[in-house]
Amino acid sequence: QTIQNIFKVLKEIFGNEKLVAERYVAAKLKDMLHDIIGRIDYESNNAIAEAKTKPPSLRKKKGKDEYYLATTNLPTEPDHLHASQLSFYYHCTKRKPFLFYVNEKDYVIFDDSHELLSKDYLEEQYNIMTKKLLSWEQLIIFCKGDLNKLAHFAEPPELNHPFYYRDLIQQQKQ
């Protein structure tokens, strides 16, 4: 059903326009050594769309040794990390941005009428992202690629990130 909902979203956003999926894009600041690379989920001549699926989660029935699949709620606002990702695709294409979330029951679509997908916000997010990446490149050069030296300059990872660091054991988290 999730796939059917994705088709509904694509029809709602793009109508009968021809689509390209998973196109690679690359960009960098003039001072950067390496390109930033990404893949646009869906793209037409006029718009881009980033898809985020919310699959059901496995839950245990209270007091029983039974499990069931529970629908994951759709967000009421775009996630800032997803808007940041979309900012890169927007920078590369300058096409109308869409961010959608879909589960097996429904979907929600955000477009540039939302503050987090506005042109100004996306450009600001792209600038923040590229400045961070440029700083990392310069730091790697300064440390001559020595990971031990580099680790002294790094801030600790965000262990509460929605999809990174899920499988760390307690020793790694410390």
Can you describe what each PLM-predicted range is?
Residues 67-83:
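A short acidic, glycine-rich active-site loop
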Residues 1-45, 172-174:
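Metal-dependent nuclease catalytic cores that hydrolyze phosphodiester bonds in DNA/RNA
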Residues 84-88:
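Structured soluble/peripheral alpha/beta segments that form catalytic or ligand/cofactor-binding pockets
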Residues 40-72, 89:
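Conserved catalytic cores of phosphodiester-cleaving nucleases, focusing on short active-site segments
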